[in-house]
Swiss-Prot record:
The protein's role, per its UniProt record: Acts as an E2-dependent E3 ubiquitin-protein ligase, probably involved in the ER-associated protein degradation pathway.
Record's bilayer topology term: Multi-pass membrane protein
UniProt name for this protein: E3 ubiquitin-protein ligase RNF103
Listed SMART domains: RING
Gene transcribed to yield this protein: RNF103
Main subcellular localisation: endoplasmic reticulum
Subcellular location: Endoplasmic reticulum membrane
One GO term describing the cellular component: endoplasmic reticulum membrane
Species this protein is from: Homo sapiens (Human)
Entry comment describing in which tissues the protein is expressed: Highly expressed in the normal cerebellum but not in the cerebral cortex.
Pathway: Protein modification; protein ubiquitination
This protein's UniProt keywords: Endoplasmic reticulum, Membrane, Metal-binding, Transferase, Transmembrane, Transmembrane helix, Ubl conjugation pathway, Zinc, Zinc-finger
Record-linked InterPro entries: RNF103 (IPR042494), Znf_RING (IPR001841), Znf_RING/FYVE/PHD (IPR013083)
Source lineage: Eukaryota, Metazoa, Chordata, Craniata, Vertebrata
Amino acid sequence: MWLKLFFLLLYFLVLFVLARFFEAIVWYETGIFATQLVDPVALSFKKLKTILECRGLGYSGLPEKKDVRELVEKSGDLMEGELYSALKEEEASESVSSTNFSGEMHFYELVEDTKDGIWLVQVIANDRSPLVGKIHWEKMVKKVSRFGIRTGTFNCSSDPRYCRRRGWVRSTLIMSVPQTSTSKGKVMLKEYSGRKIEVEHIFKWITAHAASRIKTIYNAEHLKEEWNKSDQYWLKIYLFANLDQPPAFFSALSIKFTGRVEFIFVNVENWDNKSYMTDIGIYNMPSYILRTPEGIYRYGNHTGEFISLQAMDSFLRSLQPEVNDLFVLSLVLVNLMAWMDLFITQGATIKRFVVLISTLGTYNSLLIISWLPVLGFLQLPYLDSFYEYSLKLLRYSNTTTLASWVRADWMFYSSHPALFLSTYLGHGLLIDYFEKKRRRNNNNDEVNANNLEWLSSLWDWYTSYLFHPIASFQNFPVESDWDEDPDLFLERLAFPDLWLHPLIPTDYIKNLPMWRFKCLGVQSEEEMSEGSQDTENDSESENTDTLSSEKEVFEDKQSVLHNSPGTASHCDAEACSCANKYCQTSPCERKGRSYGSYNTNEDMEPDWLTWPADMLHCTECVVCLENFENGCLLMGLPCGHVFHQNCIVMWLAGGRHCCPVCRWPSYKKKQPYAQHQPLSNDVPS
């Protein structure tokens, strides 16, 4: 989890640096920044109208370019970033969806029960044509949707009784707005009574009703009274402008943040004395001033603070978030972090997606479970001081320059989702590359596993868990005895013969390690046949001397082993755990035996160097209870125990897919034993 969190933070850092890189490219090519002010005089008439439409100001009665330019200047300063966003939004030809209501309950659930938004609904009476035609309605939907106003169509033929009860006997337009200034209050439905069925007139009617909810100040005395008043609102945003009514985006935000932020419009059109505004620090017109308990904040002086709905919405959300905003943010972060598993996990493709689905389910479940006590905690009484300090911390942190950069980057990447997804994919591929390289350096076999191998191992794990649940999750002790360790005794009880054994494929048997048992100083059959003539020419006296000398050396070794307890304990510790239980004598005591049919020397030591590193040293097969002879074929299991190849193959092929000694599954890997294996030079010759 911490690794994924680190990669996610690294990805956000990459996005931040990439945004600064794009700004540098734009500055190098054009010589301008996104925060640079634009002179409206240099803009065309079409671009000026685009700016007014994005801000929500009507221009139907302004035929001259000069009047349109003055209206843009009165509504606020224009930045290069806002101009670029407005032109890009105008060029986008995406169709905005509109809701078709199926009846009374559907209408009530979406319109009347929605307390923090505006709805524009076209009601079509029975056997009547709609008030607004299809083409004009599509333009209307596109125009109002940029201000967060949702639209829909209610056809009375689907529920005529509800239309009669409402008095909708003719086709009309209905607007739903919150009735009170409290959050989640009642809504009121207003019917359009205008005669002109045009987009601009309908939009003007909508903005007029939305602006009526904003507190408006017309004189300095009223401003002084309002400025010094302390009430329930911790955040107040003032618009000082020479306009008839506030822009539509300002009115839409006042409804969206009902109960959290108070919006106040100060109309300075007919003011003669503006000295009080100078006293409170208002020098320029128009000005967007945020009043907080800590002081005033001038909106529009930092990066990304445009005069638009999206920019001011993200700014206010960061200062006064809802619980739902925090939950959505945590949900996005958790899922972005969970998707990192797709690139961190190595091996088969199916394995990656299985791990991803498992991680997504786990993380989202834990997130929801974690939010339940948080919601319960927030409903406790006497938490006003906690809320106050938390919001104060948010206000301090989110009014910094760094926070403005983060908000600007958020708006940039949200308007370019393809860039966001491509950078996330590129970041993930880099993680996959370095993770694969790191695991290959560690000789990890899972990197090269294919889909079939992984599915086979998954099926083996599932069947092993289904039929032998303890063996699937319990790690066996490395050095222990059944009589001393009760866990191993319980493990043994988990495999009674009365249990059903899983159907496990025997393909893994051919991958088990196999090798020849050899002894030091003993030749193979070919070497024996080649050197037979030389052996026949040896003198009888030399053989007698050699045998007598070897016998003396053997007797000396036996005396040393019996007289030195430290050496004997060392020998027993180095032997395999099965030697004491299943072998008649320990490997050290078995040196006097013959290890091969061709060996007549009693002190020949097995050549342990030919054994795999993770195999336990033993000289007897516990299946047939016979000693290993020189040149015989051996096979080892993942647990480290060694047997005759024929014996263990017959054992496994009979359906007993476990070690005859420790009952470890013969198809399941196990950590190698971290113990010193005796070599030939450890025993004195």
